[in-house]
């Protein structure tokens, strides 16, 4: 019953005597005479897996994959990805990256012809393809069979200028109709707006545009789809991770993974002070909630079980020893430790990192080194893009393997990045992380949330959703907060680092609230560089931190972007992976912020006093 604890205790006594998909698309359900693209692709993948050898699967290109599809499958992939109705005859104009070459595969097959000119948007060359359609239902196809590239958008031009165009029954339900003009946000799932548009032929200016979902660009990906994980699950627990889904003072959530043969789990836990006694107290037990996670495209590890426990009724400010397992003698993890949040205002420290995403082995060296350098941190914030392929489990396996020994001792506090949102929905992320469910009504629980630790409150937001959908909740949460220190955590930055990137919707809906309720810092990611702004209020530099908010962008992985000089940048650097430690000191109400590189060298620092 207390096997793991007893084994370790006995060993310690002798020594003393001797000296861790499927994505589900949300929104309006598919309606039509054919199966959805999602169901069709699932059927294709299942057939490929059962009838084609691993060697052929890994060598398959787009041409080969297309040749293996049935006429019905080709028709669905060419016409059922995006559908809508128009009330007047229109010219549909597909705007896509020139680098896509012969993609989408259906473009020429269906009679679209090039318009004969190209322009550059956000540093990417795009071209235009057109075809006339009559009144009624119009269906457009998938972005590609290979994945990658940005999703196309579709402009609509009435064939008769004097007619008024109405677009109805738009599917998927998340898509929206916009206008081809300066400031257009071409994708509903990305906040970046187009910069000032170059001169367009007059006939294109102001056209209605179907704003698409960029993360659906991989919906029909059939190439390089099958993987092997480098870290397959075993019977023994691994990927042990701490999070919070309740009050950090009195609860602790624990998640872990096992192979398919282990179908149940539990946690044994005891106060560290009781464990260290000459006659240790018996550990308590809490049963886990277990679910099967299946990934057909993971060839060597398609099924695992994931287990979640939330321990309640803990004492504030108390260290605990725990182990996870299935109850068998040899089915326990090594002992680990967590500490609950203090029940009163006390000084504390926490770590913050931007995108890990790429080069997870190198990132692992950073997070391990950071924890060795600052083992006193209470928890670790990650501002999105923890992995590159958020709905492919082998990427998460690498993430958890690289962070082993850290996130089983210190809770991780994640925000959702665009890469967790792979395929248009962060399904695997939501399955893996047990987080507070106190976010805005009308959006999925755990995508936005808030929690308090000592005299600080943290507001975690999702920039893949609309800013408007979280603004009312955010204001209520900020207004109700009595914390001395306030931090926002989200992925896409309000003040960008990367050239030609901008996220005006964040500044429209969120930063006025940060100004009104005096947010101290916004902890961001996405731009793969390091940037710290001057204190900002009303979108202007102000004299000191007592008047404005400091916005940080950082990256902890190995993917880097260039950085533009910006009038709001107080300090910036590129090609540097960093971790940040924030020390909140009660004496003098002081925040000491420091940024370190992979060698532990101090690269930036700031002190805020209240």
Predicted regions and their residues:
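Structural beta-strand segments of beta-rich domains
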Residues: 80-82, 90-92, 250-254
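Noncatalytic modules at the cell exterior or secretory-pathway interfaces
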Residues: 130-144
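Acidic, histidine-bearing metal-coordination/catalytic regions of metal-dependent phosphoesterases
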Residues: 164-351, 577, 583, 587-610
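Extended active-site neighborhood of metal-dependent phosphoesterases/phosphodiesterases
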Residues: 308-310, 319-337, 395-482, 509, ...
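Active-site environment of divalent metal-dependent phosphoester hydrolases
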Residues: 322, 358-364, 388-392, 418-425, ...
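Active-site neighborhood of phospho(di)ester-bond hydrolases with catalytic His/Asp-centered motifs
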Residues: 352-354, 379-385, 411-418, 461-462, ...
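Core catalytic region of metal-dependent phosphoesterases/phosphodiesterases
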Residues: 364-422, 516
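Active-site-proximal segments of metal-dependent phosphoesterases and phosphodiesterases across multiple
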Residues: 484-524, 541-544
């Amino acid at each position: 019953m207390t096997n793991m604890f007893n084994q370790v205790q006995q060993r310690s006594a002798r020594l003393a005597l001797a000296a861790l998909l499927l994505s589900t698309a949300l929104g309006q359900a598919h309606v039509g005479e054919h199966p959805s693209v999602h169901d069709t692709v699932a059927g294709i993948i299942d057939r490929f897996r059962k009838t084609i050898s691993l060697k052929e699967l890994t060598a398959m290109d787009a041409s080969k994959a297309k040749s293996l599809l049935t006429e019905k499958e080709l028709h669905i992939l060419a016409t059922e990805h995006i559908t809508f109705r128009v009330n007047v005859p229109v010219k549909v104009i597909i705007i896509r990256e020139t680098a896509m070459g012969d993609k989408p595969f259906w473009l020429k097959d269906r009679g679209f012809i090039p318009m004969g000119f190209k322009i550059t948007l956000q540093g990417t060359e795009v071209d235009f393809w057109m075809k006339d359609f009559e009144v009624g239902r119009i269906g457009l196809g998938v972005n590609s069979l290979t994945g990658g590239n940005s999703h196309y958008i579709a402009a609509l031009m009435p064939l008769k200028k004097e007619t008024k165009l109405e677009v109805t029954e738009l599917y998927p339900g998340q898509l929206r109709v916009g206008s081809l003009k300066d400031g257009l946000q071409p994708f509903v799932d990305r906040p970046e707006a187009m910069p000032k548009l170059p001169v367009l032929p007059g006939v294109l200016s102001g056209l209605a545009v179907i704003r698409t979902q960029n993360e659906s660009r991989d919906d029909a990906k059939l190439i390089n789809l099958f993987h092997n994980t480098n870290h397959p699950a075993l019977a023994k627990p691994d990927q042990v991770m701490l999070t919070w889904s309740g009050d950090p003072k009195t609860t602790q959530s624990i998640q872990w993974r096992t192979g398919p043969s282990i179908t149940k789990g539990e946690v044994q836990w005891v106060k560290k002070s009781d464990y260290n006694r000459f006659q240790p107290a018996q550990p308590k037990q809490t049963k886990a909630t277990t679910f099967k996670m299946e990934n057909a495209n993971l060839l060597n590890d398609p099924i695992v079980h994931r287990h979640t426990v939330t321990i309640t009724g803990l004492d504030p400010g108390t260290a605990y020893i725990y182990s996870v397992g299935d109850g068998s003698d040899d089915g326990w993890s090594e002992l680990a430790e967590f500490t609950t949040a203090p029940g009163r205002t006390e000084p504390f420290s926490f770590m913050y990192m931007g995108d890990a995403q790429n080069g997870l082995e190198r990132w692992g060296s950073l997070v391990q080194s950071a924890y060795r350098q600052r083992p006193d941190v209470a928890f670790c914030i990650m501002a999105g893009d923890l992995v590159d392929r958020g709905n492919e489990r082998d990427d998460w396996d690498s993430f958890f393997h690289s962070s082993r020994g850290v996130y089983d001792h210190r809770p991780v506090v994640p925000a959702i990045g665009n890469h967790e949102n792979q395929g248009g929905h962060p399904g695997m992320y939501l399955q893996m992380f047990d987080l507070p469910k106190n976010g805005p009504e009308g959006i999925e629980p755990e995508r936005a949330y808030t929690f308090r630790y000592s005299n600080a409150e943290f507001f975690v937001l999702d920039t893949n959703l609309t800013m408007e959908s979280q603004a009312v909740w955010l204001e209520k949460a900020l207004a109700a907060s009595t914390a001395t220190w306030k931090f926002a955590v989200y992925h896409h930055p309000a003040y960008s680092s990367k050239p030609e990137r901008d996220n005006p919707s964040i500044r429209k809906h969120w930063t006025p609230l940060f100004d009104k309720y005096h947010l101290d810092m916004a902890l961001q990611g996405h731009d793969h560089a390091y940037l710290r702004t001057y204190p900002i209020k009303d979108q202007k530099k102000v004299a000191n931190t007592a008047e404005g908010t400091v916005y940080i962008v950082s990256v902890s992985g190995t993917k880097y972007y260039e950085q533009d000089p910006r009038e709001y940048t107080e300090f910036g650097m590129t090609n540097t992976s960093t971790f940040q430690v924030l020390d909140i000191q009660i004496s003098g109400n002081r925040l000491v912020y420091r940024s370190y590189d992979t060698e532990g060298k101090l690269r930036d620092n700031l002190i805020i006093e209240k």
